[in-house]
């Protein structure tokens, strides 16, 4: 009895710091954001009148907010699809294929993930620089000067330029996650499939993909959360939301710290509900029976 009590005390003691930190830095701020969104406060310090849902009514009629939501939906969709495909492709090649320099490529692919978003923004500012940037210079060298653009200054393509940077930053992280799952798949499954005449492509779709599916489902949630956060930082550093690049967190930031604190919190509530709902939808539509080996 005393042993069980000691074990229970030890478990609670280990969990307590994490629970306390989660309450202080996640639960309390989230509740505060919801509460403040119903008031008319200009800043964090001064009180404001209770306005119920007025902030939300104004928010949903603001074309800038609607455009920012369209931008983040486009960004999440493209970043998720392209990163998912490339990360799985590279993970498969580095796990299932034998060639020289595998460890080198693992390191190269992962390097962008250890760089801060500020460094990545600086790298792509140099790449996209219109007059003597790396990309335009390369296009001129290979005789495609007609394709040169102001990559971060043209409203028609600037969002796609940002998306490319976010994809480059994310591939290595998800590749490593998928490699970890693929490495745990028993080799005898592939050997049996080969004896049955299954080629590598069929083996991928019949063995690899089903057995790493739960990992893919988990990473889809990461895609949503990380893209919302990283797109804000990248946009804030490079364009500050101009040229139609504003995403919801930029919109929230600009409003909350420009004398519309409660209105910015209302935008924050919408962003939270959007990310929560999208994560739930992705979790449900990708749900399938767990395959074990």
Indicate residue ranges for each PLM-predicted region.
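A structural signal for multi-pass alpha-helical bundles of membrane permease subunits
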Residues: 3-293
């Amino acid at each position: 009895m005393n042993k069980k009590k000691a074990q229970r005390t030890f478990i609670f003691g280990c969990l307590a710091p994490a629970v306390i930190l989660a309450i202080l830095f996640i639960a309390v701020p989230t509740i505060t954001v919801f509460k403040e969104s119903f008031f008319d406060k200009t800043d964090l310090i001064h009180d404001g009148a209770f306005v119920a849902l007025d902030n939300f009514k104004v928010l949903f009629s603001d074309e800038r907010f609607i455009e920012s939501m369209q931008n983040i939906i486009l960004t999440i969709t493209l970043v998720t699809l392209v990163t998912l495909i490339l990360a799985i492709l590279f993970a498969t090649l580095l796990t299932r294929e034998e060639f020289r320099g595998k460890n080198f490529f693992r390191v190269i692919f992962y390097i962008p993930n250890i760089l801060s978003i500020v460094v990545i923004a600086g790298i792509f500012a140099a790449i996209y620089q219109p007059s003597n940037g790396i990309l335009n210079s390369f296009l001129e060298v290979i005789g495609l000067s007609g394709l040169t653009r102001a990559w971060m200054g043209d409203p028609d393509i600037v969002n796609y330029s940002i998306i490319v940077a976010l994809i480059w930053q994310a591939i290595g992280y998800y590749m490593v996650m998928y490699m970890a799952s693929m490495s745990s798949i028993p080799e005898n499954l592939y050997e049996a499939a080969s004896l049955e005449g299954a080629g590598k492509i069929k083996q991928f779709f019949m063995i690899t993909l089903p057995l790493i599916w739960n990992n893919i489902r988990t990473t889809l949630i990461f895609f949503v959360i990380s893209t919302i956060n990283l797109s804000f930082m990248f946009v804030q550093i490079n364009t500050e939301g101009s040229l139609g690049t504003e995403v919801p967190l930029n919109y929230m930031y600009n409003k909350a710290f420009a004398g519309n604190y409660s209105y910015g919190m209302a935008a924050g509530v919408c962003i939270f509900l959007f990310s929560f709902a999208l994560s739930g939808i992705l979790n449900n539509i990708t749900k399938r029976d767990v395959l074990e080996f």
